[in-house]
Amino acid sequence: MRVLFLYGLCVRFLYFCLVLYFSPRLPSSGNRRCLYAICYMFNILWFFCVFCCVCFLNHLLFIVEGGGFIDLPGVKYFSRFFLNA
């Protein structure tokens, strides 16, 4: 999850820089704020989709009640492997 957190921070920083430096420079223009809000909402939506996919796969494949260690990249779950077939 650290990788997703760092990825999210990098994407938000990149969007912030793009919005500040590449949007119209008119003083009365609200385009900068609108574009930043749209990009920020898109990023939150992406995180929500990834969260739903991870929860779905976790519910489908694993029961976190005991069994053995499953080593994921940097994270260890103590769980029992279970496949709904």
Swiss-Prot record:
One of its GO terms (cellular component) is kinetoplast. Its main location: mitochondrion. It is found in: Mitochondrion matrix, Kinetoplast. It comes from the Eukaryota. InterPro entries: Ribosomal_uS12m. It holds the Pfam family Ribosomal_S12. Keywords: Kinetoplast, Mitochondrion, Ribonucleoprotein, Ribosomal protein. Protein S12 is involved in the translation initiation step. Belongs to the universal ribosomal protein uS12 family. This is Small ribosomal subunit protein uS12m.
